[in-house]
UniProtKB/Swiss-Prot annotation:
It comes from Mycobacterium tuberculosis (strain ATCC 25618 / H37Rv). S-adenosyl-L-methionine binds at residues 32-33, 67-75, 93-98, 122-123. The gene is umaA. One of its GO terms (biological process) is lipid biosynthetic process. One of its GO terms (molecular function) is cyclopropane-fatty-acyl-phospholipid synthase activity. It is an enzyme of class 2 (transferase). This is S-adenosylmethionine-dependent methyltransferase UmaA. InterPro entries: CFA/CMAS (IPR050723), CMAS (IPR003333), CMAS_actinobact (IPR047672), SAM-dependent_MTases_sf (IPR029063).
Length: 286
């Protein structure tokens, strides 16, 4: 098999703007993925922790298990797993900022369990683990590597292994037509903007892709849970937070970066409300 090299440069260009800039619109968990508003009155922080619980509960974690978080971000999911599920954790990320931030954050949590954060891609990871969670990282993996990703994940899990994959989803033109979703030239321009300015190298899967590649690696898809309007609400809050911190954001970065992120957050909210984009959690079992 050809050796795969992680896309470090792409990931670092996306996430290594500055931790403080992201903290202006994210909640204290620093989760940069769709929240789960289990109750209408939830704060963003409560909804992000509810999202982590929603994902982790599907893994049937038991004390002492080892959980791998692929694309662990700023460590919010790892922290939740350590504090609420009493497991050993390994988080991997391609972002140096996220790696340093997560290491420092998790070092402050009292636990008898093993806690590791690595600057490493899934394609370099070969340790055996009991469970895998990946929230908002799959979008950067590229379709030509989907097969290898699911095969690697399957190989490092035990016979009763479980994996939770949380990813943004797209639809084919045919599906959008059937759903009555009309894609305008403005929508097409926004897609181009996202691909060039915000997530260079990103590629969104369709639900069918997850089924096809996961099942080809011998996973069973136990459950799919879509969270489309939860992401629209998350993005709405992020945009409001960033707008409220406009002066600080410009001081930290620039007016150009501030405007770029406002355009991105408001445009993505529109995509989720309109039905162009979706987001789902896929529970995979061996």
């Amino acid at each position: 098999m050809t050796e795969l090299r992680p896309f470090y440069e792409e990931s670092q260009s996306i996430y290594d703007v500055s931790d403080e800039f992201f903290s202006l619109f994210l909640d204290p968990t620093m989760a940069y993925t769709c929240a789960y508003f289990e109750r209408e009155d939830m704060t963003l922080e409560e909804a992000q922790n509810a999202k982590f619980d929603l994902a982790l509960d599907k893994l049937h974690l038991e004390p002492g298990m080892t959980l791998l978080d692929i694309g662990c971000g700023w460590g919010g999911g790892l922290q939740r797993a350590i504090e609420n599920y009493d497991v050993n954790v390994i988080g991997i990320t391609l972002s140096r900022n996220q790696f340093e931030y997560s290491k420092a954050k998790l070092a402050k949590i009292p636990t008898e369990r093993s806690v590791q954060v690595r600057l490493q891609g899934w394609d370099e990871f070969t340790d055996k683990v009991d469970r895998i969670v990946s929230i908002g990282a799959f979008e950067a993996f590229k379709m030509e590597r989907y097969a290898a990703f699911f095969e690697r994940s399957y190989d490092i899990l035990p016979d009763d292994g479980r994996m939770l994959l949380h990813t943004i989803l797209t639809y084919t033109q045919k599906q959008m037509h059937e759903m009555g979703v009309k894609v305008t030239m403005s929508d097409v321009r926004f897609m181009k903007f996202i691909g060039e300015e915000i997530f260079p190298g990103g590629q969104l899967p369709a639900q069918e892709d997850i089924f096809k590649f996961a099942q080809a690696a011998d996973f069973s898809v136990e459950k799919v849970q879509l969270l489309q309007q939860h992401y629209a609400r998350t993005l709405n809050i992020w945009a409001a937070n960033l707008e409220a911190n406009k002066d600080r954001a410009i001081a930290l970065q620039s007016e150009e970066i501030y405007n770029k992120y406002m355009h991105y957050l408001t445009g993505c909210e529109h995509f989720f409300r309109k039905g162009i984009s979706n987001v789902g959690q896929f529970t995979l079992t061996k």
